[in-house]
């Protein structure tokens, strides 16, 4: 009998009516001849409220105790979902990550899955039960509760689908699929019927909030078909698959916007082996995640200019770090450009089509939008633009590539 894994996010189980709606979806899948595993997030904003409570009690709560606290949110929701299914007359059982055999490393609040023992789940499924698993959590080898970090319930669902060799992993959320852009910012955005794992991974890494990149990576690695659809309607969603049909015929599949970026530039660094390594080692030690790294060498070959982007940090903190780096590594001077946003276009068709960059930059030029940095990869072109121009830039590139017209 085929196995279906269904994941329900916090908004999809935010209250009793939505919990009953999720329960009915699981029962429907069971009656269609499937064995059903549900992965459920904490209700609504429960995780945020629990985190706030922790910081009211302690200025620096232990990560281990944070995991103990945050994991309770999912335990509430899985029990309520099991009750709703039982109320409808069907057998169901709720399990925590530890009870389901989801083993992780010991990196509290950012744990990574090491293995899943599926024996208990399979036994329960063979008994005809719907199994409801708490997302976002696991247990390490010393039986400490761990949590998987941002997007943890998505990761739980895809990992379970892979371990169980499920027919599909269905992600139920408050949107009805993956769009060519955020429809709140681009009213002309269209829903995609299918998208490749590579394209979805890039979109998720660059601001698309439908799914977390880590779960997409798992789906790609283990060949898990992922269906993203609304928990509130029966509208067809989006299928994320290894190779989308006509993948290279569509040049650009989607566009994204990320806010809150800054650009740090160090001028006149000595052009010596190990300089860049030392700079980024210092940044790593301060837990600063950087990207869009660029280095240019001066005409005399003696000095280099090194620049990189940073997201989500206070300007004062960045200035202090930049000054420290400039002093330590003997930079001539440095600059910080804050209040930037990143606009990206993603499409597997870029591999075989020419003129993508020209069309993107032409659209931005027509809107008189300044470009502060350009970064490219095989299927992505990203630009940094002034934050006040960000939405206009997103709308311009979306229109330039016909994403308001193209269905995929």
Language model region names:
Residues 237-408:
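A conserved regulatory-domain signal marking ACT and ACT-like small-molecule sensing domains
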Residues 168-172, 226-228, 291, 373:
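Short hydrophobic alpha-helical runs that function as membrane-insertion/retention elements
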Residues 43, 175-177, 222-226, 230-235, ...:
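Glycine-rich beta-alpha junction loops
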Residues 1-216, 384-389, 401, 405:
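Nucleotide/pyrophosphate-binding catalytic subdomain
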Residues 95-97, 229-231, 293:
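Conserved beta-strand termini and adjacent loop/short-helix elements that scaffold enzyme active sites
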Residues 32, 88, 222, 286, ...:
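Conserved dinucleotide-binding and phosphotransfer motif residues
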């Amino acid at each position: 009998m085929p196995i279906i894994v269904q994941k329900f996010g916090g908004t999809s189980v935010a209250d009793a009516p939505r919990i009953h709606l999720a329960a009915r979806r699981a029962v429907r899948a069971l009656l269609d001849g499937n064995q059903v595993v549900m992965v459920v997030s904490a209700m609504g904003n429960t995780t945020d409220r629990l985190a706030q409570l922790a910081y009211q009690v302690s200025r620096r709560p232990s990560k281990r105790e944070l995991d103990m606290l945050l994991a309770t949110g999912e335990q509430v929701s899985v029990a309520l979902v099991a009750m709703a299914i039982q109320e409808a007359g069907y057998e169901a059982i709720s399990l925590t990550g530890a009870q389901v055999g989801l083993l992780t490393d010991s990196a509290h609040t950012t744990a990574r899955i090491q293995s899943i023992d599926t024996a208990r789940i399979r036994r329960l499924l063979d008994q005809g039960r719907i199994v409801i698993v708490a997302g976002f959590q696991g247990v390490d080898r010393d039986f400490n509760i761990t949590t998987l970090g941002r997007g943890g319930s998505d990761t739980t669902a895809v990992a379970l689908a892979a371990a169980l060799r499920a027919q599909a992993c269905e992600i139920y959320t408050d949107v009805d699929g993956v769009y060519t852009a955020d429809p709140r910012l681009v009213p002309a955005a269209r829903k995609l019927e299918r998208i490749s794992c590579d394209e979805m991974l890039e979109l998720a890494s660059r601001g698309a909030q439908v799914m977390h990149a880590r779960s997409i990576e798992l789906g790609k690695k283990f060949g898990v078909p992922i269906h993203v659809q609304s928990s509130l309607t029966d509208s067809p969603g989006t299928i994320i698959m290894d190779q989308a049909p006509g993948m290279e015929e569509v040049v650009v599949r989607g566009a994204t916007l990320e806010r809150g970026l800054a650009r740090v530039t160090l001028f006149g660094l000595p052009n010596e082996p190990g300089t860049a390594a030392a700079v980024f080692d210092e940044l790593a030690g301060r837990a600063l995640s950087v990207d869009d790294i660029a280095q240019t060498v001066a005409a005399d070959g003696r000095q280099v200019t090194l620049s990189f982007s940073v997201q989500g940090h206070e300007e004062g903190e960045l200035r202090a770090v930049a000054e420290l780096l400039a002093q330590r590594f003997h930079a001539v001077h440095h600059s910080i450009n804050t209040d930037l946003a990143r606009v990206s276009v993603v499409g597997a068709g870029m591999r075989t089509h020419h003129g993508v960059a020209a069309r993107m930059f032409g659209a931005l030029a027509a809107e008189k939008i300044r470009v502060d940095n350009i970064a490219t990869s095989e299927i992505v072109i990203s630009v940094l633009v002034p934050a006040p121009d960000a939405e206009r830039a997103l709308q311009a590139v979306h229109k330039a590539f016909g994403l308001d017209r193209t269905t995929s």
